[in-house]
Design a protein with these regions (language model features):
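Metal-dependent nucleic-acid phosphoesterase active-site entry motif
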Residues: 1-17
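Alpha-helix/helix-capping structural signal
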Residues: 8-9, 35, 109, 128
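PIN/NYN-family metal-dependent endoribonuclease catalytic core
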Residues: 13-47
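Residues at the C-termini of beta-strands that transition into short coil/loop
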Residues: 34, 75, 125-127
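Extended, non-globular alpha-helical segments
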Residues: 43-65, 136-147, 151-152
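Active-site neighborhoods of divalent-metal-dependent phosphate/nucleic-acid chemistry enzymes
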Residues: 67-102, 136, 156, 167-183
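Acidic, metal-binding active-site segment of PIN/NYN-like and related structure-specific nucleases
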Residues: 88-122
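Acidic, PIN/NYN-like endoribonuclease modules and their adjacent C-terminal/linker elements
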Residues: 109-183
Length: 183
């Protein structure tokens, strides 16, 4: 399943980490465009108060880890998109170009189902998306999350801390699924 990740998902690392960990495990395929990554860079600089070089380095590392995720030549699809906020048309265009089924975003109101259905797309919150991937592949997803948690050094964290932070960051369904699996 190919999922276009919206720029707002890259800002909190506690959210992008599980998404990319499940992708690294082969449970989903992420997609984005240069414009999505540029929006993510600007948001990271603003929210995390880091310089451009640091935000760029973070996103460049993600792009190197997932070289097939970059949707190219999406611009030709943008004029056909009719959203209430025309600044979001590029997200739909990139999703179409990438062959995505899903746009994963916190801004669900910006991606109405009737417009997305014209392109065979739907939008999901990261909570619903992560939970659906977990439900489709529970053992593999749990293994990926264990690897993620054990890899964290700055700061180190336990699975319980990971679950609690995900809950706080508006991922309650996914946090509950992890908690139920851990026991």
């Amino acid at each position: 399943m190919i999922a276009l990740l919206d720029a707002n998902l890259f800002v909190p690392t506690w959210i992008i980490d599980p998404l990319l960990s499940l992708a690294e495990a082969g449970l989903c395929e992420p997609a984005w465009s240069a414009r999505v990554m540029d929006e993510a860079r600007l948001a990271i600089m603003e929210v995390r108060h880091v310089p451009d070089v640091r935000a760029r380095g973070f996103l460049d590392a993600i792009c190197r880890a997932f070289p097939m995720a970059m949707a190219e030549d999406w611009e030709r699809f943008e004029p056909d998109v009719n959203l209430s906020d025309p600044n979001d048309g590029h997200v739909v265009a990139a999703a179409r170009r990438a062959g995505a089924e899903t746009i994963v975003t916190f801004n669900l109101k910006d991606f109405p189902a009737d417009e997305l259905s014209r392109y065979g797309l739907h939008a999901q919150s990261p909570d619903v998306f992560l939970t659906s991937v977990f439900d489709a592949h529970p053992e593999e997803a749990m293994d990926a999350m264990r690897r993620l948690v054990s890899s964290k050094r700055h700061p180190p964290r336990t699975m319980s801390e990971e679950i609690e932070r995900l809950r706080v960051l508006r991922l309650p369904l996914f946090a509950r699924r992890l908690s139920e699996t851990v026991g």
